Amino acid sequence: MTAPPPELVQLTAGSMVERWTITKKLGEGGCGAVYLCTDSTGKYALKVEGISEQMQVLKMEVLVLNELTKRGSRHFCKIEDKGRYGSFNYVVMTLVGKSLQDLRKGTPQQSLSLACSLSCGLQALEALEDLHNIGYLHRDVKPGNYTIGRAELNELRKVYILDFGMARKFTDNNGVIRKPRAAAGFRGTVRYAPIACHKQQELGRKDDVETWLYMQVELTVGRVPWKELTDINQVGQAKQNIRNTPDKMFVHPCPAQELKQIMTMIDSWDYFADPNYAEIYRLMKQALQNCGKPEFPYDWEPGMPLNYMVK
């Protein structure tokens, strides 16, 4: 008989983890939960994970965030505290605001305004470039893994990237790119996964960027063409087919010309390629300029339609 899966760690409001007071649960994942906590300096997020969990996700999170903090990174949470308490490991980090997925779904059309989606897309790609620069891939890029900052910290224009549970180091200790494995399992979320993932190939930096492009389309239009498909192979096929009919993906109000150029660039890169982020930023800024709307305010700032979601 196999042992039952370990129970997720459950903390109650008012309980203490070292100096942190638990306020409420914010969410739950496969390996643990996230809580709102406070100390004398303010509000933070506390992530917990049982020490018997086979996948030690928090370990990767701490590794990545510590490395990024050394570089003074713009789009990442800061670790305030970490340790072991009773039967679980915990990390206390920056408390962020709503996810881009929640904000997108807060609109009747399920999409952000064009200027807002392009500006957030630029920040989302900056975050990936920073991550890649320290030798890590994210491998689960999606709107649910990006958030905005909190109004009380004056961070409504700041985009954070979260969740490094699927991250992988693609360089060795000397900064040399590791040889790709002959076969790699499926990683990530089917809707946004890159074609290489459907083929069970090793993922590289270009694959994070491909995934970012699908996310960009969804933020701008409200959907990707394969939204209704559930079969993993059909979704993979749809992504390949869209290369022949890109207009079916880059529908109004997408800046089709620029996004097509970006997709062509991504498709020309191989596993070892160092993505040309600068050229993508240039095309995104060009699209922003051409859309004829100001970059700011974002859709959730005071006086804007989504402001009700961040109060």
Predicted segments, located by residue:
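Juxta-kinase regulatory segment immediately upstream of eukaryotic protein kinase catalytic domains
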Residues: 1-15, 23-24
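Catalytic-loop of the protein kinase fold
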Residues: 132-153
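Activation segment/activation loop of eukaryotic-type protein kinase catalytic domains
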Residues: 147-187
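Structural motif in protein kinase domains
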Residues: 96-106
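Protein kinase glycine-rich loop
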Residues: 23-29, 34
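Short beta-strand micro-motifs within the conserved protein kinase catalytic domain, predominantly
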Residues: 78-89
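Activation segment signature within eukaryotic-like protein kinase domains
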Residues: 120-121
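ATP-binding glycine-rich loop module of kinase domains
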Residues: 37-59
